[in-house]
A protein has these predicted regions:
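Tryptophan-centric aromatic hotspots in well-structured domains and transmembrane helices
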Residues: 23, 58-60, 75, 104-105
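Acidic, Mg2+-coordinating catalytic module of metal-dependent nucleases/exonucleases
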Residues: 31-41, 45-51, 77-117
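Conserved non-catalytic scaffold segment of RNase H-like nuclease domains
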Residues: 1-37, 83
Length: 117
């Protein structure tokens, strides 16, 4: 599982931070890249402690997709449920699934009604 992959990895925390910064900086300026995902407060605390340069590069605001889930379940309990996740706990799968879930909320909950004046 995950622990085995971590133990076998040759990528140090410093190297991972550098690679991530290189990637993020290609797509977003400093203080404009928003951390997004499910239950990301622990992720942000990890970045603050272990990857401070990356943490400072990111915008201080975050989009926690799990907050959308909590609001929708309480405000619109009759609404269709968001897509289920594989729970593979692989970073790329988690990222894609979080984006898919956020897209689902946009298309099914936060859609703009057609109005004419």
């Amino acid at each position: 599982g995950l622990l085995e992959r971590v133990e076998k990895s040759q990528v140090t925390v410093d190297k991972a931070e550098k690679q991530t910064l290189e990637f993020v900086s290609k797509w977003a300026d400093k203080n404009s890249a928003t951390l997004c995902g499910n239950s990301i407060w622990v992720d942000r605390r990890f970045l603050h402690k272990e990857m401070p340069t990356l943490d400072k590069y990111l915008h201080y605001r975050m989009i926690d997709v799990s907050s959308f889930k909590e609001v929708v379940e309480r405000w619109y309990p009759e609404t269709l449920r968001a897509p289920t996740k594989k729970q593979s706990h692989l970073a790329m799968d988690d990222i894609k699934e979080s984006l898919e879930e956020l897209r689902w909320y946009r298309e099914n909950i936060f859609r703009q009604e057609n109005t004419t004046s």
